Amino acid sequence: MLRTLSTSEFAEAIGISESSARRLADSGELRIRKTKGGHRKIPAAEAIRYAREIKATVVRPDLLGLSTNVIGNQPIEADSRSQRLLTALTEGHYAEVIGLLQALYISGVSIAEMCDGPIRFAMNAIGSAWPQDKRSIFIEHRATILCVRALSFLSSWLAELHPPPPFLRSFHDSSMSYTHT
């Protein structure tokens, strides 16, 4: 089941007033679902889409289901993105890798830009440590696994934000089920 937020949770997550959140929902700028009782519910994926679109500072990432490890009130400086990712990958800190990539995505960086920028820089730096550092092969393999896991996590996250069109849904659903005969 997909996580939903009340208007007060959404407002707290991005640091706006609850009345502003209700106005956004009522004006259609924010896609919502209404409960049988008439309460506005905002899918977490929609809250993330909106925060990214307006480049909002995410004050409470935990309310959006995001990592609290890196995302916070401070934007990530462009120069430090690659270095922070390199450190997280080298030290094997998966939660920090996820948090950094989530923070980059929320700030408007595309997956392609992440791969061509900070991920490429980090993987090149890790790969160039060999043959001087014999541990570098292990570190490179672990970093590759962490990147694949983090990007896989982000792709599942993006699937919520941008579900496949109806004509592909049945194909996608059927291709994911395996049966033994």
Model-predicted segments: where are they?
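Polyanion-binding surface elements
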Residues: 1-20
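Residue-level preference for nonpolar/small residues embedded in alpha-helices
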Residues: 3, 16, 96, 121, ...
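Short, contiguous strand/loop micro-motifs
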Residues: 8, 72, 170-174
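Residue-level marker of alpha-helix boundaries and capping positions
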Residues: 12, 91, 174-178
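Long amphipathic alpha-helical segments
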Residues: 20, 29, 33, 37-160
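Residues in the recognition helix of alpha-helical DNA-binding motifs
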Residues: 24
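Conserved mid-sequence domains
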Residues: 156-181
